[in-house]
Amino acid sequence: MRLPTLTFEQLDARQKETWSKHAERRDKPVGPYLTWLHSPDLMDKVSPLSNYFRFDCNLPVRLREFGLCVVSRFWDAQYSWSAHVDKAIAAGVPADVMKDIAAGRKPSFKADDERIYYTFAMEILESHFVSEKTFDEARKHFGEKALVDLIGAVGYFSMLSIVLNASETDLNREPPFADVRGYKKT
């Protein structure tokens, strides 16, 4: 980790307040929160957004975890991939789909919602735009409310991935991607 990992005892009053608010919904800060804790005002703004996309948005848990992994792989964010790949599989995403994504291959999807989510996310991430066909298919399948949540989730998960990579958040596991070692492409 490029920034010091702060213990509760090292925090100033403002950081302790933020830590305590965070602990109401989750345990102690880990992953990106270890970085955000250095800016408690930012962490106070990001935490509710994170909670929304992780726990409360209009997409099923399976697609929340799947989407987080799709975006994490795009950004080579090993920490978030490692923290969520097993959750995605436990929620019902086939392990072979996750293996393909980890290897940088487009999976053969059995579930339409996973295929639509993946196609939408990869279009916006790779080209910065979404085709009319992909947008219309996603709107028809998910409905407008869940589609807007999907768009927001791709943006939030991108921010999360960037924070994890820029701060080089400790992985504490075997690297999940064959083409990434440390925080560099091989």
Give the positions of each predicted feature:
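Hydrophobic alpha-helical segments
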Residues: M1-T186
